[in-house]
Structures are given as structure tokens and as C-alpha cells.
């Protein structure tokens, strides 16, 4: 931003979404909606609506679960919620669309990156395994190794099968 001479035109704030005050022309939220939790998604979208200026746009990057799996998923703790990301929750597109609409926002576009993210996870897993000796020397044991190898493989398979997706979507305040 500074190198491009935009520091007088752009204000970046890294903060908890619940602490936002004022109106913004643009809001970006990158892979944090998963940490909001099922019970707080309505408030998350309400906060975006409240803080987005008229005609303002928000860009969200989120990991989502396929609509056909959502009902089972939302009522049962999965491996990631139990061992990796307690309290995490993947929304589905249908619920996102409902929250967006209920808050007077409009989705402009959805872009899927599931295949790209599957490839990224494969690279991360391979790099993790290549660097295992360095990691082990920091005090991590074989249980940790198996857990993370499984986690990365589990996620890669989820993206490849389209059971989960990495989406970017933009929405606008009507």
C-alpha cells in the first residue's frame, strides 16, 4: 500500500469483527468465518451490514461444507472440531445465502478454489514430512506427526471430493 502511494486512501484494521465501529466502503474477511461458530453467524453478517456503507462491498474467503452434508455435520463433532480446531464450524452456501439476504446484502459472485486448496494441502503435507526431523527436534512426537499428516490428508481429500470447498464471495450492501 505504501509502495503504491495509497497509504492516504487505504486504512487497514486488523481487529475482532465484533469491535468494528463506523462505516467502511470495503470489508475483507479471510478464513475467519470458520472461527465464528454456528450460533454467531447471524451476528457476523449483521456486523458486516451495520458497518458497510451504502453500496459498500465485502469480500469473504471461507471454507464451506457441501449443502448435502450440512445437516449431519452441524449436529455432530468431526475430527477437525475435536482435535484441531475446537469450536470451529464450516458454514454451507445455503446458510451463507440466507444470512446475506436476511441482512439486506446481495451476493455478487462466488468463486471456488477447492482444487487449488487440495493441491496446497498436498504441498504442505509433503513439506511437513520433508521437514519432520527439524520439527521433531523442537519437541514434537510421533503422535503429533500422525495427527498432522492425517489432518492434511483428510482436508486434501475433502477438497478433492468437493465435500468441502474454499470459496471467495463478494457481497454488496443494497
Q: What do the PLM-derived regions correspond to, one by one?
A:
Residues 61:
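Alpha/beta-hydrolase-fold catalytic nucleophile elbow
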Residues 64-174:
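Substrate-binding/catalytic lobe of Class I Rossmann-like enzymes that use SAM or dcSAM, i.e.
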Residues 35-36:
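A short His-aromatic
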Residues 1:
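Conserved hydrophobic residues forming the short capping helix/wall of the S-adenosyl-L-methionine
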Residues 4-17:
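Conserved SAM-binding strand-loop segment of SAM-dependent methyltransferases
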Residues 6, 22-25, 171:
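ATP-dependent adenylate-handling active sites, centered on carboxylate activation for C-N bond formation
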Residues 42-57:
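A short glycine-rich, Lys/Arg-flanked "PGG" loop and its adjoining helix->strand segment in the class I
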Residues 15-30:
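A short acidic, Gly/Pro-enriched loop at the edge of an enzyme's catalytic core
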Amino acid at each position: 500500500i505504501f509502495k503504491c502511494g495509497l497509504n492516504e486512501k487505504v486504512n487497514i484494521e486488523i481487529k475482532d469483527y465484533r469491535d468494528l465501529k463506523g462505516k467502511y466502503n470495503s470489508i475483507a474477511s479471510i478464513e475467519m468465518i470458520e472461527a465464528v461458530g454456528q450460533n454467531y453467524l447471524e451476528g457476523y453478517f449483521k456486523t458486516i451490514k451495520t458497518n458497510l456503507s451504502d453500496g459498500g462491498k465485502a469480500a469473504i474467503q471461507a471454507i464451506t461444507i457441501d449443502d448435502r452434508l450440512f445437516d449431519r455435520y452441524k449436529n455432530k463433532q468431526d475430527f477437525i472440531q475435536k482435535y484441531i480446531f475446537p469450536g470451529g464450524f464450516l458454514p454451507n452456501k445455503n446458510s451463507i445465502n440466507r444470512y446475506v439476504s436476511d441482512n439486506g446484502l446481495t451476493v455478487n459472485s462466488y468463486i471456488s478454489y477447492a482444487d487449488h486448496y487440495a493441491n496446497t494441502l498436498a504441498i504442505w503435507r509433503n513439506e511437513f514430512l520433508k521437514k519432520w526431523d527439524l520439527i521433531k527436534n523442537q519437541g514434537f512426537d510421533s503422535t503429533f506427526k500422525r495427527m498432522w499428516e492425517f489432518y492434511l490428508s483428510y482436508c486434501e481429500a475433502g477438497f478433492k471430493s468437493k465435500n468441502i470447498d474454499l470459496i471467495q464471495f463478494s457481497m454488496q450492501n443494497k
